[in-house]
Design a protein with these regions (language model features):
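Alpha-helical elements of Rossmann-like donor-binding domains used by nucleotide-donor carbohydrate transfer enzymes
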Residues: 19, 23, 40, 66-69, ...
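Amphipathic alpha-helical packing segments from all-alpha helical-bundle domains
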Residues: 15, 29-42, 49-75
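Helix-loop "lid/cap" segments that line or gate small-molecule binding pockets
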Residues: 7, 22-29, 38-46, 119-122
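Short, polar/charged, Gly/Pro-enriched helix-capping and turn/loop motifs at alpha-helix termini
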Residues: 31-34, 102, 126
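N-terminal hydrophobic signal/anchor transmembrane helix of membrane proteins
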Residues: 1, 6, 10, 20, ...
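Hydrophobic alpha-helical connector segments
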Residues: 2-34, 81-88
């Protein structure tokens, strides 16, 4: 039936969101060049407008807009999609800083996975 098809589509979409998000997080934290570039953009965004734009595109408004578009397609509600994207991406953005200061990096990856599982489970319920 149609509800089952929609539920399966959402589950597939959630799995892809989780995979994509984890790959991006690992890219910006564990790959040496990307991690150093992220840290440089974080510092230089306040001195160089070009770096500020790159920072926004790669780490702030760019990922938020991408998630908003995904959630808009899934939810069919642009206003709800914006808030959902903020709720989803905000903690992930914070985890970049936590990761940088953590001795146990694997614990931060676990926090990322738990956040995504909890968030997407809550989203499926509502």
């Amino acid at each position: 039936d149609l509800e089952k098809v929609i539920a399966e589509y959402k589950e597939t979409a959630f799995d892809k969101i989780k995979q994509f998000t984890k790959v991006q997080f690992l890219h910006w934290t564990e790959e040496e060049f990307s991690s150093c570039f992220r840290k440089m953009m974080t510092l230089e965004q306040y001195r160089e407008p070009q770096m500020a734009q790159l920072y926004q595109n790669y780490l702030a408004s760019g990922p938020l807009a991408y998630m908003e578009a995904l959630f808009s397609g899934m939810l069919g509600d642009a206003e709800k999609a914006r808030q959902t994207a903020l709720d989803f991406y905000g903690p992930i953005f914070l985890l970049y800083s936590i990761y940088d200061g953590a001795e146990d990096k694997s614990h931060v990856i676990k926090l990322l996975e738990e956040h995504m599982d909890h968030f997407l489970q809550e989203m499926q319920i509502s």
